[in-house]
A protein has these predicted regions:
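EAL-family c-di-GMP phosphodiesterase catalytic domain
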Residues: 40-49, 68-83, 95-214
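Catalytic core of bacterial c-di-GMP phosphodiesterases, primarily the EAL and HD-GYP domains
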Residues: 6-85, 160
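Conserved functional hotspot residues or short segments at active or partner-binding sites
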Residues: 88
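Small residues (Ala/Gly/Ser/Thr
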Residues: 1, 18, 178-180
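Regular, well-ordered alpha-helical segments
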Residues: 23-27, 94, 172
Length: 214
């Protein structure tokens, strides 16, 4: 589907469903801050002239605040599609949606695009997080990426956090956001709603939010 126009139809279906579900939960539970949703989007769709209009339609239809929608595009897609330009990203940022670079660090690309593209966050590829405890080289790369995001004033998110040791090391290096099986396994709608309810009423917490032991 990635190589055909079918991917745009798939992207649109996922975007609409995700925005509708997140806004439903925001209205039901009034979390503070409001829930946001990350949606992976194809390079073919990013450069589409119709994407901006479609997002306006979906955000208006669902009532979701634009900054609650975070579009993810892989670094490899940026490298592999020279027609992805800063202008394409700017068209989306003007709506108020956020843009995140997924799988950062494995694209073998020039870092020049980081200063030219209006992005909100970098997501450190899981391949660097996997060996962050044993491999000092990988740890140095993660630390360098974190330092880079601070200089660029964008968020940094670690992918593939699967152990408490990895989480502790990432915290030590200054990374405050992460995703992975240690934090939560993938959840379907009912189980995600149950977790939202537990967190709202103080009966459940994610590992990343639990207070550290003294």
């Amino acid at each position: 589907a990635e190589e055909t126009s079918m991917i745009i139809s798939i992207d649109r279906w996922v975007l609409r469903q995700a925005c509708q579900q997140i806004q439903t939960w925001n209205q039901m539970y009034s979390p503070d801050p409001a829930l946001s949703v990350n949606v992976n989007i194809s390079a073919k769709h990013i450069v589409s002239q119709e994407l901006r209009e479609f997002l306006i339609e979906v955000l208006t239809e669902t009532g979701l605040e634009p900054d609650s929608l975070k579009l993810e595009i892989t670094e490899f897609s940026i490298v592999d599609h020279s027609d992805i330009t800063a202008a394409a990203f700017t068209r989306l940022k003007e709506l108020g949606v956020q843009i995140q670079i997924d799988d950062f660090g494995i694209g073998y690309s020039s870092l020049g695009y980081l200063s030219n593209f209006p992005i909100n966050a970098l997501k450190i590829d899981r391949s660097f997080v996997n060996d962050i405890i044993e491999d000092t080289g990988q740890r140095d790369i993660v630390e360098a990426i974190i330092a880079l995001t601070k200089r660029l004033n964008v968020q940094v998110i670690a992918e593939g956090v699967e152990t408490p040791e990895q989480l502790a090391k990432l915290r030590e290096l200054g990374c405050k956001l992460g995703q992975g099986f240690f934090l939560s396994t993938p959840l379907d709608g009912p189980h995600a709603e149950q977790l939202i309810t537990q967190i709202k009423f103080g009966t459940g917490m994610l590992p990343a939010l639990e207070p550290k032991e003294n």
